[in-house]
Amino acid sequence: DFGRGFYCTTIKKQAEFMAGRVVRRQGGIETVNTYELNEKIFEDKELNIKIFEGPSKEWAKFILNNRDREYKEITSKECNSDNKYDLVIGPVANDDIIVLFRTFTNGLIDIDTLIKELTYKELTDQYSFHTERALKYLKGV
């Protein structure tokens, strides 16, 4: 959703689901690690942190641009292909939401309808770390 990075969540059930999904797709052993995030990360003025409080036009465009392999404006603030953001926080676009995104990109609904529909879906959270500077604030528990 937010570009190539190390993804975490505050929701254990979501972490377990995603671990299972990775094992089904790639094989291996299902593993869920627990980390503690040092809150001082939000005081570090050298980090570029992007936070989406909930579904919004900006959030939807950001995810669409990160998932679009043909998106060329990687320096745009509307994507993170170049890891301009050290940390991005916001809702997860789950499989139901992906169907809505496709409906939008195919021109069958407008952006306002997309956002309205997203607010009725069960949303989860994700923290995506994109640089070593941001990762230093994570500690294994």
Which stretches of residues belong to each language-model region?
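Conserved NAD+-utilizing ADP-ribose enzyme module
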Residues: 1, 17, 21-141
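A short, exposed loop/beta-hairpin motif centered on an aromatic-Gly-Thr core
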Residues: 2-7
